């Protein structure tokens, strides 16, 4: 392969061409987490897995893979996956929205636990949600970013 097509109209998994992004989350309970992302954000559950394969969800233009963790495995011999400590996060999902107040109200009504209400900061308005496993999800609306 000489090149990778980044911009595409389809976000199929597996991709027929180009790439698709999948966000892997290590969770304590795959069923609980799958239904949380379905209820709060409207993610589509594609498969709940079969005990060996993990659940796959589609949320907007990304894929989510939920797994209970474990390891090491032959393809990652020194890596163990575990649910995060909710007070020590090293990465998080960032959802960009057109109307943060509307998303805040809708997702809160669906059970999202927001750490704060939306707050203006650094050219955007943002807030954070904590999911059932302690992951934080940034929700942001750009207020100063210009395209073109």
Which residues does each PLM region occupy?
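Conserved active-site tyrosine of GNAT-family acetyltransferases
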Residues: 33-38, 107, 134
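Conserved catalytic-loop position in the HRD/HxD motif
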Residues: 99
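Vicinal oxygen chelate
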Residues: 2-22, 44-95, 104-130, 141-148
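Conserved beta-strand-loop-alpha-helix junction that forms the acyl-donor binding cleft
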Residues: 27-30
